[in-house]
Swiss-Prot record:
Its EC number is 2.1.1.177. Specifically methylates the pseudouridine at position 1915 (m3Psi1915) in 23S rRNA. It catalyses: pseudouridine(1915) in 23S rRNA + S-adenosyl-L-methionine = N(3)-methylpseudouridine(1915) in 23S rRNA + S-adenosyl-L-homocysteine + H(+). It comes from Lactobacillus acidophilus (strain ATCC 700396 / NCK56 / N2 / NCFM). The keyword S-adenosyl-L-methionine applies. One of its GO terms (molecular function) is rRNA (pseudouridine-N3-)-methyltransferase activity. This is Ribosomal RNA large subunit methyltransferase H. Coiled coil: none annotated. GO terms for cellular component: cytoplasm. S-adenosyl-L-methionine binds at G108, F127, G128, K129, L130, T131, M132. Homodimer.
């Protein structure tokens, strides 16, 4: 299975980089995991809703340029569907069973994702109603992907 995580912005904090590298290493026995960073668009401190949409649109074009037609795409979104770790693990397993060997996860920038990115999504996924930095979301997401593979392999990691 090939898993790609497309994220807006560059990860700067070493502790986040270290955590992600650790989970990538752990996942390597189950899947090839690629992380693709696209540049974030600079926005003024105070901006209008139209400027907000323009930033999301520009970032959205950058995201969409990294997604292939055959990929099954999850977009992280507050309004997405929440599921348990077990439900998520079953979805990942089912995708592989039914021929989706390329799965892409999208984490938008601080303003979220554009309508075009959300329309391209096969599924909108939420990790709760809490707001968190998108850099931290990368760690949460990759850990949950790892947890899904561990659940599917029958490992006691999830207990």
């Amino acid at each position: 299975m090939n898993i790609k995580i497309v994220c807006v912005g560059k990860l700067k904090e070493k502790y986040f980089k270290d955590a992600i590298a650790e989970y990538q290493k752990r996942l390597s026995r189950f899947a090839k995991v690629t992380i693709v960073q696209v540049p974030d668009e600079k926005a003024p401190e105070k901006f209008s809703e139209a400027e907000d949409e323009k930033v999301k649109e520009i970032e959205g074009q950058r995201i969409l340029s990294k997604i292939k037609d055959k990929e099954y795409v999850y977009v992280t979104a507050i309004k997405g569907k929440q599921r348990s770790s077990e439900e998520f693990a079953k979805e990942i397993q089912d995708l592989g069973t039914y021929g989706h060997s390329d799965i892409t996860f999208v984490i938008g920038g601080s303003l979220g994702t554009s309508d075009a990115v959300n329309k391209r999504a096969d599924d909108l996924i939420s990790f709760g109603k809490l707001t968190m930095p998108h850099q931290l979301m990368r760690v949460v997401l990759i850990e949950q992907i790892y947890r899904a593979f561990m659940i599917n392999s029958g490992s006691p990691y999830h207990k």
